[in-house]
Amino acid sequence: VFGKDLSGKKAVILNRSGLIGLPLQGVLINNNCTVTTIHSRTSKTDVDMELKNADIVITGCGKRKLFNHKDFGDRCKLIIDCSMTKIAGVKGVGDVDLEDILLYRPDIIISSGYGQTGVLTTVALVNNLIQVYKLNRGD
């Protein structure tokens, strides 16, 4: 994944859907990442603590600009925002305030969501489909 060694990295996924959260959880675990999945019933205290300790954050909450630079700890180096909320006159806005991150945390690599994560989702789904096909064939 991403051409990097993820062994020992801590990933936080804010989504438990079968389209985003669960497949990515499997991919990250298979790449020796420690994964925490956060969902709508996770306490705010736990969400805050997990985000502060994450190396990688993947969001899929569907809440525009829910997070900004203050939510992420110094360890965080990669954010993948899988959400996109359309706003009249604007292309779309994700869970993470992109402009805020670019201004205050230029050390973080962040997807802008719009036009990027849809491609990542498609690639992940195709990859999952190939893996299931191979398993069913007995490879």
PLM regions: where:
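Surface-exposed beta-strand edges and their flanking turn/coil or helix-capping segments
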Residues: G26, E50-K52, A124-L125, L135-D139
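Glycine-rich phosphate/diphosphate-binding loop of Rossmann-like nucleotide-binding domains
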Residues: V1-D71, L78, V90-K91, L98-D100, ...
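Rossmann-fold NAD(P)-binding glycine/threonine-rich loop
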Residues: I80-R137
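A generic membrane alpha-helix/interface feature
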Residues: C33, G73, K134-N136
